Amino acid sequence: MEAEHGDVWEALRPLCARVMSVPPEAVVPQARLVADLGADSLDITELEAASEELFGVSLRGTEKAGVSTVGDVADLIVRLRTPGAHSPLAR
C-alpha cells in the first residue's frame, strides 16, 4: 500500500496545485485545503471531480469528516482504491 500511496501523492500534488492555483511546492501532505491553500467550495468540488477521473474513485458522498489536509485526501483515495474498503457511502 505504501507504493500506491506514493503513486497517489505524485498525481495528487500537481492536481491540487492546478485546482487551487498555488505553486506545487505549497502542496505538502500537512497543507490544509482551506486554511493553507485557500480552497473554496468550488475548488473542493473540482478536486472531487478530477480525482474521480484520475483515480477512478468517487469522493462525492464519502464520509469526509476529518479530511482537512492534502495528506488526508491522499489517504482517503488510497482507502477507496483498496479492495473491500468501500463503504455504502462511497457509492
Where are each of the predicted segments found?
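Phosphopantetheine-dependent thiolation modules in NRPS/PKS and related acyl-activating systems
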Residues: 1-49, 53-91
